[in-house]
Amino acid sequence: MFGLIKSATRKTAIKTLTSATEDALESLFSNMEGTDALLSRLGVDRQQALDAVVSDDEVAACLEDLHAAMLNKPWRIYGEDLGDEDKDRLWKTLKRHLPALAEIVLTARLGGYGVGRYVYQPEPDGFLTIKHISNKSGELAKYIPYRDGSLVYRGTGGEEACNTDVLYLFIAHRATSTNPAGEMAAARLYAPVALRKKGFIYAAQFITRYAQPYLIAKIQANSNDDHDSFMSRFYRFVSGGALSIEREDDVMMLQNSADGQAFRRLENLANARIQKTLLGKVKTSDLETASRASQETEENNRDERIGAYLALLSRAAQHFIDALVMVNNAYGKPI
């Protein structure tokens, strides 16, 4: 009976200790303020938020799932009066660069917009193919989108307009006239990522202090000399070795029985927010209980969530094909 009362009290205490953090995360995600206002309240800019979020391992795991799911979908190229040879060449070129396009799409989802630069190379028959796509996620802050849909590179030499027809790929996520840079998921993910990275630095001092066991010795000491002599042998025993004691003496170990439930609950709160934002649902492997039915539901919701990313990827793929056709019709082998 005492065990049941103790267990219930402990569970309530853990929930109480983490309720303030849970409420703060809930308030952050339910707030309808825009990206710029939220970043201002957090005290970081777009690039800082994006870099912090992308470097998190839980975010990286979710992005890997999304990246694999996007590449797993079938694709087909169609065009009126398009010959089989040109269609095969366009498809092989697109297929080779689909992973890079998917990376830029994920950057657009996290950072509000994604930018990639096409690097062209001529082939022996005169066809201008795209050799490489340079993802500009590491310097996204230097590329400024404007309300008219144009993109400007702001470097040390001033501003320079970017050719978004054939040279640059520019994909924005939910861009509006008042927010041409798009809605970035990294702004809302910054708080749970910071909790995962920095919150447990604070908790580590308690782990260091209370996770180690304590040895307690009870002896029959007739004088301080007897006590000091035993303590000297006891310290040597702790460092390694053996210890002999009298029949009336006793040595026991006290160890903290806490299993880290409070810390695990905080981590689960952060992971759930990250997964729900990116995947649309918390993974069943991170839930306390999971069933076959819930796993099937998770797969269905995951497929629906992938549709939003595929819409961005289809825009990127269409831009890729259009750029190839325009460049070759103007300077290379006409298609």
List PLM regions with ranges.
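Detector for Asparagine
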Residues: 31, 72, 135, 163, ...
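Short linear motifs in intrinsically disordered/low-complexity regions
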Residues: 32, 46, 52, 57, ...
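Surface-exposed loop-to-helix/strand elements on domain peripheries
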Residues: 81, 219-220, 243-315, 319-335
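Structured, contiguous alpha/beta core segments that scaffold functional sites
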Residues: 2-44, 77-237, 242-245
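Intrinsic-disorder/low-complexity, polar/charged segments
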Residues: 51-59, 184, 222-223, 306
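A eukaryotic "domain-start" boundary segment
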Residues: 39-77, 83
